[in-house]
């Protein structure tokens, strides 16, 4: 099981938020995002949908537009670790879409930026530290995503493997 220091270190790397969810649905938040800016708190249907996704998977990476999330099964207890949201492109458009979709009413809503490769590597590390399980990039995408989203994921992956780097505005 991962400790709080490790999780705070992951937050430093991804600039995102981490939530520990126990079997009874209790949520322990680690990070600085306010509840009124957290899609998992403002949209309970979204949280329930995420918790019911692919229950057999030990890790589940999913996205809306260019905003990424991850769900990792907790070892030894029933529950999940949720990470995200982080946006993988520069600009305000993804944040505005997420705010509208998940009923976030903060006037100047912004999402943290994290390069896709960095986010995926951090989630692979989280999975390994929590469960001892190793995965490769191709095992991270979710087959439940629509075909165009899967294609977009693999195009970004190929671009990164060829040495492409996204600009980090922070």
Predicted segments, located by residue:
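Hydrophobic, helix-rich cores of sensory/ligand-binding and other regulatory modules
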Residues: 1-24, 39-170
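Amphipathic coiled-coil signal-relay and dimerization helices
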Residues: 26-35
